[in-house]
Amino acid sequence: GDVYKRQVLNCGSSSIKYKLFDMTSGEVMAQGGIEKIGLPGAFLKLTDKDGKKVVIEREIPGHQEGIEFILSVLTDATYGCIKDYKEIDAVGHRVVHGGEEFASSVLINQDVINKVIECSDLAPLHNPANLKGVRAMEALIPGIPQVAVFDTAFHQTMPDYAYMYGLPYGMYKKYGVRRYGFHGTSHRYVSRRACEILGVPYEDQKIITAHVGNGGSITAIKNGKSVDTSMGLTPVEGLLM
């Protein structure tokens, strides 16, 4: 049978994190990241087959070159795990802001790209970088299915009293000023995993999840749906970070 290989990309303003999954076994075939895109001292770091960290320094002027570098490492004789990068049959992208347009992950087409561009006012550092990753993969493997996974999507189930601010209603209608929340993919995963470990049904629990990374947020989840979260219009709100 075919072994499906899926690449997951998280493109930031000057970084790209990547993982390659074997979807048959669920295992991670390769993982790493690029830092300092367009800056002096740019490098790619990866975890090799023995779990050792390897750093390769190289000039990386932009995201396109960064993704080309990642694909060349994936097919490299020493560090690689695939013979040809065309073995990758789908790509998932973290997209930070889906606004009110997206309540789930979606297959990317031109309409989706246009909507992500519209949401760029709300995430000017992240959304344009996320799209650079999409365009780079399309240029390298034309026609490859690409999926956008939104940080905000999980929180679209919040009731209006949780997402509305105490501001003139026109600001919401005209400019989309409301609580959106972030880290949704993480909160959804953590809440489901907690229920798995506890052996309880996900659909009838009340759960508080905490995402603690460089940024931090907490979410209230009732019956499998996000009902409130600490981040707001932007990721700056909420917990001290």
Which positions does each model-derived feature cover?
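Short glycine-aspartate micro-motif
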Residues: 6-8, 90-92, 147, 207-211
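A structured beta-alpha segment of the ubiquitous adenosine-cofactor-binding alpha/beta core
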Residues: 52-84
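Glycine-rich phosphate-binding loop of actin/hexokinase-like ATP-binding domains
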Residues: 156-241
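Short beta-strand-loop/turn "lid" adjacent to the catalytic site in phosphate-handling enzymes
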Residues: 74, 78-126, 147, 153-162
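Short, small-residue-biased leader/transition segments that mark boundaries at the very start
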Residues: 1-4
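Gly/Ser/Thr-rich active-site cleft segment
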Residues: 93, 110, 123-190
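Short glycine-rich, Thr/Ser-proximal phosphate-binding strand/loop in the N-terminal lobe
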Residues: 15-61
